[in-house]
Amino acid sequence: NNIPIYTLQNGAAGKADWASKTADEIAADIAGILNYIDTLTQNVEHPDSWVMPNDLYTSLNLRRIDGTGESVLSYIKDHTPQIKNWEVAGELSKGNKDYNSTGKNIGLLYTKDPDKMSHEVPMAFLQHAPQDRNLEIVINCEGRDAGMMIPYPLSACLVYGL
């Protein structure tokens, strides 16, 4: 795929994952991702949606910035008004081996526009009429899924190792 991948820098603890980073380092990562897209697309693309694993969202929402009552997530939301949609997806979690084989949390920053990214289903799930076969009733089903269509791959950015 041609979707750009942003590489996280190690924090003061020597690790790149957000569980090991301070609030300032996480904010710097978000700024770095946004600046990376701006530089890569020469300010043409302006992503407005961020997807992250459920457990990471909860962790950032419950973790307080030292000396304040504000959570890391609320601080990031307040200071990145260009990101309007904050979404969670369990498939991006490092613990979900069915969909995520990297062993790391994944983040996705993208432009929520059906012209730039869409899920194509050429044939929706269809159940045919029940048929008697021998001593059982069989219901044949069919469906087709084309997956994600991303005609503008630079309108999204993947981040591994959150």
Role assignments for model-derived ranges:
Residues N1-D29:
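Alpha-helical scaffold segments that mediate packing/assembly in large oligomeric complexes
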Residues N1-A12, D38-V51, Q131-D145:
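Long, contiguous amphipathic alpha-helices that act as assembly "spine/axial" helices in icosahedral shell
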Residues D55-R63:
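Short acidic, S/G/P-rich loop/turn micro-motifs used as interaction or catalytic elements
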Residues A23-N43:
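Phosphate-interacting basic helix/loop segments used at nucleotide- and nucleic-acid interfaces
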Residues L62-L162:
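Sequence/fold signature of self-assembling virion shell proteins
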Residues W50-D55, Y110-T111:
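Short His-Asn-centered micro-motif
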